Amino acid sequence: MDNRYNPKIAQRNADVLVREKVDLVIEFQTDEHVAPIVAAKYREANIPLIAIEVPHPGATYFGANNYEAGLIGGRHLGRWAKLHNPTDATEIILLALERAGSLPRMRLTGMLVGMKEVYPALENAQVSYLEGDGKLGESFEAMRKHIRTSRARRFVIGAINDPSALGALRALQEAGRSESCAIMGQNASPEGRAELREPGTRLIGSVAYFPEKYGAEIVAVALDILHRRPVPPAVFVKHQLVTPENVDHIYPNDRLTLATAPTI
């Protein structure tokens, strides 16, 4: 069933699954405010729930260690800034996805902590949060609007995901200011990896979550629950920094996929 990123549809789908008396539900529902409502439906029906990426009360969480993923990206961004960016007139910009709630926002918290841990001089930099809704278009518009009024000469940017990172990058390219920035993404999604392969890109990295491996791992957790074996309240995936230098090593099949894709 597809929730279509729509809280009303998510609730209707939950009602259907409860009526069907399923044995277990694996739920990807991204609106934090609806999570208690959806979780309560399953709890009242005694249906165990695995919540993917966004916590639901009483559910087993499966997904990112958001703070750790943020630290990985932030430390890399801090190392880059230390080598390339003097701190004067540098602004830190963090592109958020507010509706996903507090846990995904910990990616941004981790990035900010990681940057300053590696490069303490950034303690004095201005920090701005922009709402990009995790989407390229909205992040492009938010960044485009911001740089019109910002007095910063350089930008160090941490994004909640790769579409947001790319939206910020496209806005800076449009303004002719891409050389004044360094951008860190999250997810190492296909579009992010494609940008990492672009010569001279200012997307200096992204943190991989490897969703292509989720299926087998989630099924293993589901079977443990159904067989009443002990399961931790949260099962975290492993993260890895992906950069222009190692993207082909970590994702060697990307070029093969592109080479065999049909042209339209």
Give the ranges of each region predicted by the language model.
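Hinge/beta->alpha junction and helix N-cap segments in small-molecule ligand-binding domains
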Residues: M1-A10, D31, G63-G73, L94-G114, ...
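Short, hydrophobic alpha-helical segments
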Residues: V18, L77-K82, I147, I218-P230
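Flexible loop/hinge segments that line or gate small-molecule binding clefts
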Residues: E32-E68, E91, S189-E198
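Hydrophobic alpha-helical
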Residues: Q11-R19, D23-E44, M111, S128-E195
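Hinge/cleft segment of the Venus flytrap/periplasmic-binding protein
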Residues: L103, M115, F210-I264
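Short acidic capping loops at alpha-helix termini that bridge into adjacent secondary structure
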Residues: D88-E91, E123-A125, E179-A182
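Rossmann-fold dehydrogenase core element
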Residues: P199-A208
